[in-house]
Amino acid sequence: MSHVSSHREVIRPSHHVDGTLRSTPDTVLWGYIATNLPPALTIKSGQIVELETLSHQGLTTNEDPENFFAAYGIPSNEVLADGKAVFAEVKRPKGASVHILTGPIYIDDAMPGDVLEVRVLDIKFRVPYGVNNTGPGKGVLPKLLSEPAAKLIRIDLERQIALFSDDIHIPLNPFMGIMAVSPPTSLGMVSSTPPGAWGGNIDLKFTGIGSSLFLPVFNKGGQFFTGDGHAVQGDGEVDGGAIEISLKPTLQFIVHKGKTIKQPRVETASDYLTTGLSTDLNEATRIALQEAIDFLQREKGMSAADAYALSSLAVDLGIGEAVDIVNLVYAKIPKRLFKSNPEFWYPPNRS
């Protein structure tokens, strides 16, 4: 079976943007991912797109977003106009989740059986604040709280920190909680909450600036969606949310023809990451580990025994998210283990 080769051409990102996709009532889906919708944008492999995305915070209550954010001291002129428009004009289908997704982007030549690489070239903040929202029934400890607990957190862009409190400042690590291709047609419309082989709500903090996300393609054009911006999040997203925020990512889309993967994969300047997805955390762990061993055998030429041993000695398993019905476990393989690695498009230790 063919696979994603680590010996691939290095395509350097340029400052040129080939397309822009705004978040408007006509270019977003609310709470679901669907297949074969009309394209919001069509591009070629290798092209770069700047996207606007919207956080769902402030849009899922019965009051409008201006009133929601006014309660936290945010003036009307700091509430995004496209968020107000989506709240007023877009209706969530029955049974849909909360996330607002921009797309779909069709990539020419992407066909079922290919792999779509999504390079995260840049992420900008659209607003200087985000929200962490939890409460009864949410997160890993659903019985911990007896009342809803929404916390607005200011973002200091100059210092690149989130001002959790006077004493606690959290370094920013922005990433898109949801990046997805359209799922197999047999699934029909799927909720945006549980992730799957198509990506989706993987909430994996390693998919920030300078990362590549690899997704299997199930439908012609790939049909890419993104949303659920996070300013920062810990492994697990344990209370059910990150600092949820509206972001503007710049992404490059590269189709790898004739390649095959079963689960989403990630590559950074320092690590290879495989993933396992399951409603059962133990099964997700087994899948992530098996994916890592398969990677080491195919990409690094190792025997199964050596790959298993190396995984026990130097590969870290972690819980990417534990709150979205389907759990995600990752296996992180440090590149420093290998004397030589193919050149990566994003240099290490880049500021």
Regions found by a protein language model. Name each.
Residues 51, 115-118, 215:
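A generic structural signal for residues embedded in beta-strands
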Residues 172-282, 293:
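Conserved mixed alpha/beta catalytic, RNA-binding, or beta-rich assembly cores of soluble enzyme
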Residues 276-351:
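C-terminal alpha-helical interaction appendages
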Residues 56-68, 123-133, 221-231, 320-323:
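Short, Lys/Arg- and Gly-enriched loop/turn segments at beta-strand edges
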Residues 78-79, 86-89, 94-106, 115-205:
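Intrinsically disordered, low-complexity linker/loop segments enriched in Gly/Pro
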Residues 43, 107-110, 207:
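Short, well-ordered loop/turn sites that connect or cap secondary structure elements
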Residues 11-12, 18-94:
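N-terminal, Lys/Arg-enriched amphipathic/low-complexity engagement segments
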